[in-house]
Design a protein with these regions (language model features):
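N-terminal segments that mediate ammonia production and transfer
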Residues: 1-175
Length: 175
């Protein structure tokens, strides 16, 4: 049953695909070309959203926000090379963002669970990358529960027949 407040189906719009989202914006190149300009426009869009979801009692304790980009292969190669890590060719690795607890024991356990899952699904764990963050402007409420933000790098098993099979493995790892 479709709520009455939604418009009727027309053209590419179909109300069947509606779901609640607060403060969502999209910036993309129609042909899918990646560029720094698209990222800059996305950051501008994000900065101009007055309300991106939940807002806490502290003016600087919101819900957090970010942007989703295409795989930044050149950037990842550069920053991981600084740590002595060489990536496989583009399309033969995946990157996931993981929020980890600050408690040392829970932190180690969570990393082990992720690494074990990767191995169980026949893929190869390459490395963890700690994502630089700047929390100076966060309120004390948020700082108290702020997680570590890491990226996990996964190498595609060469026996997988194609990129779609790898994407399916990454999907299961993510869950």
């Amino acid at each position: 049953m479709q709520p009455e407040y939604l418009p009727k189906r027309e053209g590419l719009y179909d109300p069947e695909f509606e779901h609640d989202a607060c403060g969502v914006g999209f910036v993309a190149h129609l042909k899918g070309n990646a560029s720094h300009d698209i990222v800059q426009k996305g950051l501008t869009l994000l900065a101009n959203l007055e309300h991106r979801g939940a807002v806490g009692a502290e003016k600087n304790s919101g819900d957090g926000a970010g942007i989703l980009t295409q795989m930044p292969d050149k950037f990842l190669r550069r920053v991981l090379k600084e740590d002595g890590i060489d990536l496989p060719e583009f399309g033969h690795y995946g990157v996931g963002v993981v929020f980890l607890p600050k408690d040392p024991q829970a932190y180690a356990e969570c990393k082990t669970i992720v690494e074990d899952c990767i191995e169980e699904l026949g893929q190869e764990f390459i490395a963890w990358r700690k994502v630089p963050t700047a929390n100076e402007s966060l309120g004390e409420t948020v700082k108290a529960i702020e997680p570590y933000v890491h990226q996990v790098i996964v190498k595609r098993n060469p026996e997988l027949e194609d990129a779609e099979a790898f994407e399916r493995k990454l999907f299961v790892i993510r869950k």
